[in-house]
């Protein structure tokens, strides 16, 4: 996403990535996925964060026009979570975005998403892996409304696995 309008923050345990476009946040010793994320997001000042994990390769060019539509929607609707990829079809909310049911599997999917930082911090629990968070965090999120998903992929990706 060469012309990304966002300030990029890279969470790393100890290494730095030197670029004028990227701010590295070092979280220190690896304890767990959720501990690392909790430590990292405490450094962020924004109310909303776009979360992309390192095991995804972007497949297509990202549309800044579509991003601007999504960004405006977030500003107007104040969601707790907005999934940017299609997994489970959401219920109709408006022409751009659908609503994720209150109780649904993988409600807190780690797919590319925009999170209200305070809600993400509340749902993360120390010691959990990303997979634990998708299962257990989804159950904790049953108490939250305001979870949404796009009808059309904003980000198309290929998942990579390292052995």
Describe the residue ranges of each PLM region.
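N-terminal anchoring/stem segment of glycosyltransferases
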Residues: 1-29, 41-43
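A structural signal for short, well-ordered beta-strand segments and their strand-loop junctions
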Residues: 9-10, 49-51, 80-85, 114, ...
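Conserved donor sugar-nucleotide recognition element shared by glycan-biosynthetic enzymes
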Residues: 33-37
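Active-site nucleotide-sugar/metal-binding loop of Leloir-type enzymes
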Residues: 38-48
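Short beta-strand-to-loop acidic/aromatic patch adjacent to the donor-nucleotide binding site
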Residues: 47-57
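Conserved donor-nucleotide/metal-binding helix-loop-beta segment in metal-dependent transferases, i.e.
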Residues: 60-90
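Short, flexible, basic/aromatic active-site loop/helix in glycosyltransferases
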Residues: 92-105
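Catalytic core and acceptor-binding pocket of nucleotide-sugar-dependent glycosyltransferases
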Residues: 108-163
């Amino acid at each position: 996403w060469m012309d990304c309008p966002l300030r990029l923050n890279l969470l790393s345990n100890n290494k730095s990535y030197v670029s004028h476009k990227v701010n590295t946040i070092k979280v220190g010793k690896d304890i767990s996925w959720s501990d690392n994320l909790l430590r990292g997001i405490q450094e962020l000042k924004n109310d909303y964060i776009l979360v992309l994990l390192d095991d995804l390769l972007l497949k297509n060019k990202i549309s800044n026009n579509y991003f601007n539509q999504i960004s405006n929607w977030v500003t107007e609707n104040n969601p707790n979570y907005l999934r940017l990829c299609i997994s489970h079809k959401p219920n109709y909310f408006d022409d751009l975005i659908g609503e994720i049911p209150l109780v649904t599997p993988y409600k807190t999917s780690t797919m590319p998403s925009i999170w209200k930082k305070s809600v993400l911090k509340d749902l993360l629990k120390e010691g959990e892996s990303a997979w634990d968070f998708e299962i257990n965090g989804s159950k904790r999120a049953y108490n939250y409304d305001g979870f949404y998903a796009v009808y059309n992929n904003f980000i198309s990706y290929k998942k990579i696995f390292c052995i």
